[in-house]
Amino acid sequence: MKLDNFVASSDIYDVYESDGMAVRIYKKPEYKEKCLYAALTHARVETTLGNSFIKMPVLHEVSVIDGKWAITMDFIKGKTLQQLMDENPDKKDTYLNQFIDIQCEIHAQYMPLLSKLKDKMARQIKTLGQIDEIKKYELLTRLDSMPKHIKLCHGNFEPKNVIINDEGTYVINWGSARQGNASADVARTYLLFCLNNPDLAEA
């Protein structure tokens, strides 16, 4: 497989386009667990969204390429909602409403087989080095008291992860998806807006 067309990169993987497929190559061989977990999460979400208007790339293969773990799925052509907002600022409110409708549709799905968002948050709190044990205990107690839901939470939902083309609406990058409280997922999106799109956070 030729991997000449570089598309994007994150801390742990690079993405290439090859023959109509998106190939996510994990940067280190020891990322095997991350690769397999991401593939399992993607597959479970893919099955659940089968009856939704939201589409997502079809996962085709998990493999090892040049000693590194890889996931191969459909390469989705089109423009992201972020690109559309940047190119058409006069339609920002329209695109933002579309974005909200998509997130509401995601949260309408129930995902009892996914890992729990609460468990992920608890692990992150426990490993924080910037706060003392008393503050950690307070945060964990508040987290435990919050309502327990099994709604689908994307975990990284922002306009750059929504692609629009002639075939419909696609949501990508499901590696952080969990089951949990939709309000937490919305709060995460708002935080991403504050960091990356302050004008959208104000809208």
Question: Which functions belong to the PLM regions below?
Answer:
Residues 4-38, 84:
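ATP-binding glycine-rich loop module of kinase domains
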Residues 38, 42-46, 103-106, 189:
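AlphaC helix (C-helix) of the protein kinase catalytic domain N-lobe
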Residues 66-80:
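Conserved short submotifs of the Hanks-type protein kinase catalytic core
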Residues 46-62:
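Conserved HxN/HPN-centered segment at the entrance to the catalytic loop
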Residues 14-17, 141-184:
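Active-site acidic catalytic loop and adjacent metal/ATP-binding pocket
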Residues 186-203:
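Active-site activation/catalytic loop segments of kinase-like enzymes and analogous catalytic loops
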Residues 26, 63, 76:
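Residues forming the ATP-binding cleft of Hanks-type serine/threonine protein kinase domains
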Residues 79-118, 133-138, 142-146, 152, ...:
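Conserved kinase catalytic-core helix
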